[in-house]
Each structure stands twice: as structure tokens, then as C-alpha cells.
Amino acid sequence: MSNLGKSTGSRKDTKMRIRAFPMTMDEKYVNSIWDLLKNAIQEIQRKNNSGLSFEELYRNAYTMVLHKHGEKLYTGLREVVTEHLINKVREDVLNSLNNNFLQTLNQAWNDHQTAMVMIRDILMYMDRVYVQQNNVENVYNLGLIIFRDQVVRYGCIRDHLRQTLLDMIARERKGEVVDRGAIRNACQMLMILGLEGRSVYEEDFEAPFLEMSAEFFQMESQKFLAENSASVYIKKVEARINEEIERVMHCLDKSTEEPIVKVVERELISKHMKTIVEMENSGLVHMLKNGKTEDLACMYKLFSRVPNGLKTMCECMSLYLREQGKALVSEEGEGKNPVDYIQGLLDLKSRFDRFLQESFSNDRLFKQTIAGDFEYFLNLNSRSPEYLSLFIDDKLKKGVKGLTEQEVESILDKAMVLFRFMQEKDVFERYYKQHLARRLLTNKSVSDDSEKNMISKLKTECGCQFTSKLEGMFRDMSISNTTMDEFRQHLQTTGVSLGGVDLTVRVLTTGYWPTQSATPKCNIPPAPRHAFEIFRRFYLAKHSGRQLTLQHHMGSADLNATFYGPVKKEDGSEVGVGGAQVTGSNTRKHILQVSTFQMTILMLFNNREKYTFEEIQQETDIPERELVRALQSLACGKPTQRVLTKEPKSKEIESGHMFTVNDQFTSKLHRVKIQTVAAKQGESDPERKETRQKVDDDRKHEIEAAIVRIMKSRKKMQHNVLVAEVTQQLKARFLPSPVVIKKRIEGLIEREYLARTPEDRKVYTYVA
């Protein structure tokens, strides 16, 4: 027992040891495994894989890699695959160069892919371990690289593949039917052979394809241009682009779409832009002239694809638009009707607005170009501000005649578009004031609402300073109505008589209304003069310290006129009268609507039958220019308005000419409006000169005010900076020239508002 105990005490604890898996294999055994795998790979390549055990093959490959023979396996695989592709596949493809080449190559490619998938599955462990550790291509990619280098990129195969694909596409472009599937398969193969890149596809197919396409389209463009009009050419280019996109979609890799479309655009559009837009009898100008909105839209769509395409279109459109605009605003022909002048511009704007909307997708570049062109030619004619005001005057006087309020509103909105293009807005304001005054004083406005609406548009555009005087005119009219009500009440209360004269006086604030600097003289006939004196006393009694000055050129009168002579036909027989009130056999009564000057002239003939021009001038004291205009209206106007006759019967009026009442005057209308000659043609040259002088005087003050405002704020400024700032501030009303600004600066220096700095005479300081 003691021995057992001793024995037990001396025994140590033991651990179970597992012997490591032997890391070395007999070379003979390794070779035998490799021979087995090599044979299997070759059988797979020959499509004889049905008798193979993939599990056994996988285990053998696993064993080789595990025992550090991965390199032998990998190298062996490369050699076996290379040998098969060189000796079998390449030979088959070479033998098919002239017979079913693409089909043979495609079949070889499909077989190779299938084989490589199977081989990859067998060698999966090598892919996971050896390939990863040694940073080499995986099994499948190795197969692709060998196929690429030994088959697809082998000398004549590579060239033949490229040429075959290019020939097929060239034939299809000419209308032949080709095997699109074969092209697609070849392109897909080239993309896969690039190993997630485009290099193989790009070098072996796409680059030569684009080069060939460029040559083809270059020749096609010459043919298209020689045989077709611009619109047909554009349609053919569109069709070509769509055809190329469709070909890419069905045959090539989708990445080729962008480059091939760029080639088409470059060869068929970019290189021929000017030729297309300038085509005689079919280019851009032809389309604009003939309102071809659809063709223009096609051109716009096509040209928007290429750099500078829209710019080229815009330049051509601009040349045509400026030519059209200059023809409309040219100063040729003094008798240009202002309403027609502006309507022509509005029609032109309407046409190009339609092109902008329907053809040019409201493109900003086209919009700016059209606006710039209108601004350019509208301001070529110095009469544009006056004519625009006369156009608005015509619409606000005659708006009801055949036009609804909405239509008038729409026309005024269009007129405002032209107003925005106008540089001399201050000139427009002066004329608008004159024409508004005439409408208000002769009760010719279509409605106060329309007038105020127009002023509101101007206010929105230019601010309240622009319209303050116009609004003041409306206030004066309202106050005058109240004053006249009070005056009539005063006459009733006092029993004072105006001697049969129905008098209406409008008291106008000098600063608001377009009064003339020197009021034209006129010897008002006694009856109306007496009536006015009664009003003057009444008004000044209420408003002491004020002055009333008659503005004869702004007044009007309704005269009761009686004509006694028989009315004769051309054959000399006498006729009855339709429109006039007839008393007795031949006496006719009319109400003549005339100006104050015309009234003064006509009332002379209550005293005598005949007057010479000099006599009328002496009696009335009307300035010669106004007198000639009034007499032309009365004696040389329309036959239905000639209440005076003149000897000799010429349109010119000279000192010795004799005037008498036209006793044969008749009209279908009881109330006859005597139009002032040339009133609708705008001002005469002397009047225009006077208006321009007034505008220039006003501008001097505005420029000086702007200079003082700026200098007061900045204290010190360099000349060019000040000129730029003044121009910026005033451009909403007019564009002052740098020369005029300089003169005004010098004027302010003389008057000691500004001073030059001693160190630099081109720098000014504000003198507080």
C-alpha cells in the first residue's frame, strides 16, 4: 500500500496533445493533385464536365492552397487557359474571319465565360486565400485578361473585329438591315473585358467609331445643306440625332450616347450654324418674316444643344429686328401718323413676343436681346416720346369707340412696355401732361377711371415724383367744378347776367399744367371777355392775393352759327339740308366746336363780310403761327369743316389773302367739331424746339439737384465716379451726357456749392 501511495504521490498531471496537420506535401502527391485539376480544367474547356465531381475537385484545390502550393495552382491555371485559348479558340476565330466571324467570336466568348465560372467555383478557396494574400487577379478576371490578350486583341482579330463593327454600323446608316444583336454582343464583350473600366471598349471600338462617324457626318452635312432648306435640314439633323441615340440604346454601350451625340452636334450643327441661320429663302430671317413659329422652335431646340448656338441665332434675329424697327421709326416723311407709328412698333413687339413664347421657350437671352433692340431703335427717333403720348391720348379719347375697357387696358399695358424702353421719360412726361390737359379741358377723356388707371401705371413704373403733377391736374379739375358750382350760385343770388354766354372756367395751378412761358396774346371778343371779368372779380374776392392769367391756347368754345346761302350741287341745282336745323328756305344752324383762337376769328365776321390776313391779325392780336394754324383749320381743312372760304384757294396762307364766311357750308351733323390742322401729327418743328428747350432747362435743374444730393452724402468724390453716380440716379428719367454733367458741375463750382481739391483738380468736395 505504501508503494501505491508513494507511486500516486510521485505521478504528474498529463495534457492531451494534438499533432499539427503536416504543412508539407510530397512533391509527387502535389503533382498528382495538379494533374487531376489540370485535366478537369481542360475537360471543362472542352465542355466534357458531366463526369466530374466538383466536390472532389474543390477539396483537391483546397489542399494545394492549404499546403502553400497556391502559386503552382495559379500559374498552372494561367498556362492551361492560355494554351486552350491560343491553340483552340484563337484558331477557330481566325478560321472564321471571312465566314460568320462575329457569331464564332461570340460563341467562343460565351463558352469561355461559362468555363471560367465553373473553374472559379472549383478554385474558390484559392480566390479567397492565395489571390487575396498575393494581390493578383481573381480566377474569373484572369480568364478575361487572357481572352482579351490572346484572342480579342490578337493582331488581325482585333482589326477585323473593329472593321466589321464599323462596316455594319455604316451599312445600317445607309438604310441596310444588319444583325444588331451581334453588334450588341461584341460591344458587351469589350466592356466586360475592360474589367470594370471602359479602356478596351473605348480603344478597340468607341474611338475609331467616333472618328468614322465624324467623317460620315461631315460628308452628310455637305449633302444635306446642298439639297435642303433650313427647316428640312434641321428636321434631318433631329432625325439623325434620334437615330444615333436609338442605335446606342439597342447596339452599343449606353456610355457612347453622349460622345456620339456630341459628334453629330459638332459636324451637323456647330460647323454650319451661320450657314443654316443665313440660308436664303429658308433661314432664320425667312422664318421670322413668315411667322414660322414651329420651324423656329425646331431651330431653337437644335441650336440650344451646341455652344454659342443660341448666340448665333440671337445675333441674326437682332440684325433683322433692328432693320425692321429702324424702318418703322425712320424720320422720312414728315406726315407720319403718331398712332400708326406706335401701333407699328406694338405690332412688331407682339410678333416677337409670340416668337419668344412659342418658339424660344421664353429664353432669357432672346428676351434681353429683343428688349435691347427695341430700346435701341425706339430711341433713334427723338419724336418717340411725343408719339407714344399721342397714341395713349388717342386711346383715352376714343377708347369707347369699338373697344371695351378691358381692350383699352390691354393696349395701355402694351404701350407701357414701349415706355419702359424709352430713355427720355421726362420728354414723354412733358408731352403726356400737354395731352392730358387737352383731354381734361375739352372733356374728351373716355373716363376718369381710365385716366387715373394710366397714371397709376406710370406711378408704378417711375414713382410718385413722376406723376405728382398729373395728379395735381386732376385735383385742379375737381376744385374747378366746385368753384363753378359756387359761381353759378353766386350769379343766381346776385342776379348778375353774363350776357347770354355760358361760361365754364378751369382754374389751373401754374406748376401742374403745361402753361406757356409767354402766354400768346389774343383780343377776346367783348361778350366772352365781359363774362370772364365777372368770374375774375368773383374768384379774386374769395382768394385775395392770387392772379388769374387767361391761357387762350388751352381754351375752347361752342359757337352758335347760322348760314344763310343756298347749298348747291355740282350741277348748280339747290338742295335741302339733312343734319342742320333749317329755318326759312335756306337758313341752317349749327353748333361749331372751336378753339379760343378760332372763336375770336369767327366772331369778327359778325361785323364784316370780308377780312384779309393782315386785318384779322390786327383785330385779334393772335401770334402769326397760331393764327395761320387756326385759319387753315377754318378755311383749308376737310370740306365738311370749311366754315370760311379763302382767295386764292391754296393751302398756304399769306398776308394778302382774303377770307369770307362760307355761306354754302353744310354738314350732316348739327354739332360740328373743327379739327386743328396737324394736331394729330404732333408738334410743328418750332413747337418741338420750344418743348425741347424746356426739357433741357428742367434737366439742368435735375442734374444739379442730383449732384448736390450725392456730394452732400459723400462729401468728396472723383469726377468720373460722380458722373457715373449721377447717370445711375437719373437714368430712370433720361440719360444725361457726361458733357452736360460736367457743365453743371462747373456751374455749381462757380456758385460755390462745390470746390476742386488743390492737390487734384478732378476731385470735388462739397461746400456746406
Curated annotation (Swiss-Prot):
Pfam families membership: Cullin, Cullin_Nedd8
Keyword Magnesium: no
Signal peptide (from-to): none
GO biological process: one example: negative regulation of Rho protein signal transduction
Pathway: Protein modification; protein ubiquitination
Cross-link (Glycyl lysine isopeptide (Lys-Gly) (interchain with G-Cter in NEDD8)): 712
UniProt-listed InterPro entries: Cullin, Cullin_CS, Cullin_homology, Cullin_homology_sf, Cullin_N, Cullin_neddylation_domain, Cullin_repeat-like_dom_sf, WH-like_DNA-bd_sf
Keywords tagged on the record: Cell cycle, Cell division, ER-Golgi transport, Isopeptide bond, Mitosis, Nucleus, Transport, Ubl conjugation
PROSITE patterns the record matches: CULLIN_1, CULLIN_2
UniProt cross-references to Gene3D superfamilies, sorted A to Z: Cullin Repeats, Cullin, Chain C, Domain 2, Winged helix-like DNA-binding domain superfamily/Winged helix DNA-binding domain
Free-text description of this protein's post-translational modifications in UniProt: Neddylated. Attachment of NEDD8 is required for the E3 ubiquitin-protein ligase activity of the SCF-like complex.
Family label: Belongs to the cullin family.
The protein's name in its UniProt record: Cullin-3
Underlying gene: cul3
